[in-house]
């Protein structure tokens, strides 16, 4: 009979195999692998692995727009992570569950879920988790057109200094534009520290702002900058791939010469 440890390992292997099928677009095979792995994980109380499997199954249902099943798997994932005492993943699962609820306009359940996730993030002192939960608050309040609340939480996400804070800066800009606070939008862009690695997002921000103001000439200018930056990025990526191929070829040639 398989031990609990070996069953946990088997479930993990199946989890990675399922993800590989998803990347290849073989969703039916992936779902079958996930279902078998989940059954194995539950039988041997491998709750942490079961949580991840449910989370990936929820993602897969999302690809197929099956909302009810996706919501159910988000609930299962959060319960399994709680049983496993993996509180970081539990908080993320609660956050994901809250976001799923918005798809069915179930806003009443979203705030309590996010409040619980936020409490956990404060106990764990995890700034990325805190920022993600604050971002979720912002997104949900934005969907309800409660722009003041959305602004407050996007600012909270930015203040954490997480690696994704620049995205929250863009989300906050969207709030100002939607709320017709265009002067504040200008002020916000000017106060943002401009780093080279996120220059694209700020040029995109100017494009969105000028478009909202009806200044289409200026908007077109910044849109063209964004297009040029994307073209340059594609060129660099292609050149990198060529260099990698050349390197592999040269290494293979050297090995042949030495044999």
Question: Each predicted region: which residue ranges?
Answer:
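Short, small-residue-biased leader/transition segments that mark boundaries at the very start
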Residues: 1-6
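Residue register of alpha-helical TPR repeats
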Residues: 12, 52-53, 92, 132, ...
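Hydrophobic positions within repeat-based interaction scaffolds
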Residues: 190-259
């Amino acid at each position: 009979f398989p031990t609990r440890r070996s069953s946990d390992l088997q479930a993990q292997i199946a989890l990675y195999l399922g993800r590989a099928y998803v990347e290849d677009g073989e969703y039916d095979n992936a779902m079958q692998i996930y279902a078998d792995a989940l059954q194995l994980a539950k039988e041997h109380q491998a709750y942490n692995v079961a949580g991840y499997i449910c989370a990936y199954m929820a993602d897969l249902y999302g690809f197929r727009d099956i909302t009810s099943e996706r919501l159910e798997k988000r609930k299962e994932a959060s319960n399994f992570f709680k049983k496993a005492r993996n509180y970081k993943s539990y908080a993320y699962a609660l956050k994901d569950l809250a976001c799923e609820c918005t798809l069915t306009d179930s806003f009443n359940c979203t705030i309590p879920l996010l409040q619980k996730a936020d409490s956990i993030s404060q106990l764990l002192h995890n700034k990325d988790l805190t920022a993600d939960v604050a971002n979720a608050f912002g997104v949900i309040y934005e969907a309800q057109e409660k722009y003041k609340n959305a602004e407050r939480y996007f600012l909270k996400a930015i203040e954490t200094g997480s690696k994704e804070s620049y995205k929250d800066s863009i989300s906050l800009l969207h709030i100002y534009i939607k709320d017709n606070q265009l002067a504040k939008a200008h002020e916000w862009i000017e106060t943002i520290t401009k780093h080279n690695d996120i220059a694209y997002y700020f040029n995109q921000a100017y494009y969105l702002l000028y478009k909202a103001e009806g200044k289409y000439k200026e908007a077109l200018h910044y849109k063209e900058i964004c297009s040029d930056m994307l073209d340059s990025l594609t060129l660099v990526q292609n050149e990198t791939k060529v260099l990698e191929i050349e390197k592999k070829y040269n290494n293979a040639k050297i090995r042949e010469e030495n044999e």
